[in-house]
């Protein structure tokens, strides 16, 4: 390797300074890969390349890592800092052998044998000039810009044309101490490490670039030759009494409507545009859990991203983040309503494939779509779809639509060899552009059809939107899920591939709910969501600034000390910092008088802020319920509190997609924290500390509207234990409207008919519609709900139910 200060290297670095823009994956190797700055470190690269090492040198200088030009000196032994598996490839002839790598590695192992306390970190580094996967028929371009083993001339062309899209990826370090202790220090282990490293770099390239892209027409021809689609075309021709040629033409039209037309050139242009857009809109995008997804890709999993759906921004945000995290943007299932000019063609070339809202019993369309989805899985393309089916208008997760999940499971049943893994993704924003529109729709205004004019209107409103949040939840590998749900699924499918298993529909429903639960498990508690939660629980949606900051400090402590799950993320900073962030985003108003500052939510914005509160209300609903038990009882035992929580939890779980694994332990941990923080005093019983009652009252306020809904339902059931589900839904909704009008409840979800349907389904599952005469469970829960309400609200509910009963009687 030439010396760092040689004229040749100086010239190369000067040229690359202007031609090359490098993106580092992960962005902070020290934090994300647990590198130890106190231990010696060497880099492993696949191929020796002066331009690659020059690019690496620029990055290591910025990150505070050792320069690749500095030799590694340990125990008197001098070794190169960069160890390459293969030598440089000349313009003609073969590249050098890997003997230098083996010799260098043997020297480092020998030093470990002599010095037991030594532990060198061996960090694999991959460099990519552009990320085009290539096409199946792209022979000319591959010849010019061949990326895996380019000659120096090809490398010059790559730097010239693709230098602005250079990626440097660091991988988890290998401990040479571990290798020496576990496997010895002979030449055999050196050869083994070389083989493992080659496999690693090959897999890493596949993760970064993805599989080759098919020619669209060749893909259509391949799909039309599949047995299932040929059969569907024949059935279409027979049922519609048309020729098979006509039915085939219809199938081609469906394919053309559905299929993506991925373009790497468009993705590169979009990356620049989106970088500008995110920098204009957001002060930062917070990401959690990307490393585990990279590892799944590296291990050969077929990845299906299942994010929640807040905004049309979701389509762009997740793809952008994955691209910058060193993964290929997925093929995205988009609603056919987005297939309008010019967005439709652009989305399609960005990887979107379009799906109709309803298949309406169209067997040919169903067969075409299923076959296309199977092909995406078979070829190794990652896929993304929104299981909610549409954007949430209230900020809560919607009940899942199971169609795409069912098709994914069916693809596994039809014999995909690789593990297929669903990755739940929580997407959150400090500002959702469509919130005002959502509330108009909830109040009865007809949804506007998507068009180019809406796009221009949205662009006109671009401003400071705060921060975005992308949290990857706990993955679900479908083969493991099927083994757990139906242990004999492989043999059942093998015996009768055409027969739909009896367990399939229940399994799909369980899986869909598990996905939604794991999305909520990965929620992001931000300054806006937390501050909204506090202020909306206060009287008049206003608090003294110092009290608001103190309450936020309590919530931050609760989330950090008693974490909801390990996948949840919590805002950095203290209560004071969070309030300031919200004020800078103009989400809250501030006024001052001689006694201090007051932070409030403007009446016009109160409904909008419920959207952000609802993003995280599930994180606080149990602590809030516990606080309500304590506030409404002078003294109460732990057992009594757990009894109340245990009675309400099945409904909360169904409504809010909660997944607390050990409820008794969680309740105890929350109570212990309350005691430690001086909020609660414990003798034989528990009671609220008088001087901290205001904080507990605020916390209890977050569950009030939920308890009011449950009080309506259980008061109705207590009066009419044999009432039908449909009657309970309609009458609960009617009474909720009355209660809201009398007590000023404005939260949109309070009047959401779908929510009462969700609750009635769960009540049926729990046996409340069995018609049995024993009403003890209903009476107990009714009594619990009533006792946790303000007297005026309780009186309204009881009186309204009695009046309704008299009217129906």
UniProtKB/Swiss-Prot annotation:
Is Ubl conjugation set as a keyword in this record? Answer: no
Alphabetically list the UniProt keywords.
Acyltransferase, Cell inner membrane, Cell membrane, Lipid biosynthesis, Lipid metabolism, Membrane, Phospholipid biosynthesis, Phospholipid metabolism, Transferase
Q: Which SUPFAM superfamilies match?
A: Glycerol-3-phosphate (1)-acyltransferase
Q: How does it sit in the membrane?
A: Peripheral membrane protein
- What are the boundaries of the signal sequence? none
Q: Which reaction does it catalyse?
A: sn-glycerol 3-phosphate + an acyl-CoA = a 1-acyl-sn-glycero-3-phosphate + CoA
* Family label: Belongs to the GPAT/DAPAT family.
State the protein's name: Glycerol-3-phosphate acyltransferase
**Which source organism?**
Shewanella oneidensis (strain ATCC 700550 / JCM 31522 / CIP 106686 / LMG 19005 / NCIMB 14063 / MR-1)
């Amino acid at each position: 390797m030439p010396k760092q200060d040689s004229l040749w290297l100086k010239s190369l670095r000067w040229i690359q300074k202007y031609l090359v823009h490098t993106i580092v994956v992960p962005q902070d190797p020290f934090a994300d890969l647990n590198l130890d700055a106190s231990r010696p470190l060497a880099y492993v690269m696949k191929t020796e390349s002066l331009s690659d090492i020059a690019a690496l040198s620029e990055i290591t200088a910025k990150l505070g890592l050792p320069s690749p030009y500095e030799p590694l000196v340990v125990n008197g032994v001098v070794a190169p800092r960069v160890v390459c598996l293969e030598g440089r490839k000349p313009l003609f002839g073969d590249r050098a052998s890997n003997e230098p790598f083996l010799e260098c590695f043997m020297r480092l192992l020998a030093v470990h044998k002599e010095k037991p306390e030594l532990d060198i970190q061996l960090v694999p580094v991959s460099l990519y000039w552009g990320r085009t996967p290539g096409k199946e028929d792209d022979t000319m371009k591959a010849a010019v810009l061949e990326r895996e083993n380019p000659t120096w001339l090809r490398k010059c062309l790559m730097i010239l044309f693709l230098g602005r899209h250079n990626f440097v990826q660091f991988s988890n370090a290998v401990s040479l101490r571990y290798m020496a202790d576990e496997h010895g220090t002979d030449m055999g282990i050196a050869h083994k490490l070389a083989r493992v490293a080659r496999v690693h770099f090959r897999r890493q390239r596949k993760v970064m670039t993805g599989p080759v892209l098919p020619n669209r027409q060749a893909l259509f021809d391949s799909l039309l030759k599949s047995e299932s689609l040929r059969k569907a075309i024949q059935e279409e021709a027979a049922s519609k009494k048309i020729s098979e040629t006509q039915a085939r033409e219809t199938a081609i039209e469906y394919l053309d409507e559905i299929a993506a037309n991925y373009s790497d050139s468009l993705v590169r242009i979009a990356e620049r545009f989106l970088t500008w857009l995110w920098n204009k809109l957001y002060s930062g995008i917070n990401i959690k859990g990307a490393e585990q997804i990279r590892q799944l890709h590296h291990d050969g999993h077929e990845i299906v991203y299942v994010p929640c759906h807040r905004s049309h921004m979701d389509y762009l945000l997740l793809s952008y983040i994955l691209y910058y995290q060193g993964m290929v943007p997925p093929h995205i299932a988009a609603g056919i309503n987005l297939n309008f000019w010019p967005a439709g063609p652009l989305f399609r070339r960005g990887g979107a494939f379009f799906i109709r809202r309803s298949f309406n019993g169209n067997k040919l369309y169903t067969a075409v779509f299923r076959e296309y989805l199977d092909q995406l899985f078979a070829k190794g393309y990652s896929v993304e779809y929104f299981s909610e089916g549409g954007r949430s208008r209230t900020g809560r997760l919607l009940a899942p639509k199971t169609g795409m999940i069912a098709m994914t499971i069916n693809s596994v049943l039809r014999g995909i060899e690789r593990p297929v893994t669903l990755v739940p993704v929580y997407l959150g924003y400090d500002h959702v552009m469509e919130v005002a529109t959502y509330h108009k729709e909830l109040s009865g205004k007809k949804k506007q059809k998507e068009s180019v004019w809406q796009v221009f209107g949205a662009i006109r409103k671009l401003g400071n939107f705060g921060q975005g949040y992308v949290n990857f939840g706990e993955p679900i590998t479908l083969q493991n899920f099927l083994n757990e749900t139906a242990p004999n699924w492989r043999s059942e499918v093998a015996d009768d591939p055409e027969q739909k298993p009896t367990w399939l529909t229940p399994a799909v429903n369980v899986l869909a709910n598990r996905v939604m639960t794991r999305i909520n498990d990965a929620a992001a508690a931000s300054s806006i969501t937390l501050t909204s939660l506090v202020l909306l629980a206060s009287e008049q949606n206003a608090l003294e600034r110092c009290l608001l900051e103190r309450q936020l400090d309590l919530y931050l402590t609760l989330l950090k000390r008693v974490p909801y799950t390990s996948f949840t993320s919590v805002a950095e900073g203290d209560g004071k910092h969070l309030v300031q962030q919200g004020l800078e985003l103009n989400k809250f108003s501030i006024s001052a008088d001689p006694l201090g500052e007051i932070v409030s939510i403007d009446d016009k914005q109160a409904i909008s802020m419920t959207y952000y509160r609802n993003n995280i209300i599930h994180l606080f609903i149990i602590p809030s319920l516990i606080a309500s038990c304590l506030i409404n009882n002078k003294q109460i035992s732990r057992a009594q509190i757990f009894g109340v929580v245990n009675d309400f939890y099945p409904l909360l779980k169904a409504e809010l997609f909660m997944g607390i694994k050990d409820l008794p332990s969680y309740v105890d941990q929350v109570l212990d924290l309350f005691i430690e923080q001086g909020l609660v005093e414990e003798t034989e019983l528990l009671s609220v500390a008088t001087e901290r009652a205001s904080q507990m009252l605020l916390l209890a306020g977050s569950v009030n509207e939920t308890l009011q809904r449950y009080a309506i339902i259980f008061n109705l059931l207590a009066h009419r234990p044999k009432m039908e589900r449909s009657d309970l839904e309609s009458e609960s909704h009617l009474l909720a409207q009355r209660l809201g009008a009398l007590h000023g409840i404005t939260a949109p979800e309070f009047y959401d008919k779908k929510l009462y349907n969700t609750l009635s389904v769960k009540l049926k599952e729990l046996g409340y519609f069995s018609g049995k005469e024993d009403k003890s469970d209903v009476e107990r829960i009714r009594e619990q709900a009533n006792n946790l309400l303000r007297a005026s609200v309780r009186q309204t509910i009881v009186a309204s139910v009695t009046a309704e009963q008299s009217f129906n009687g």
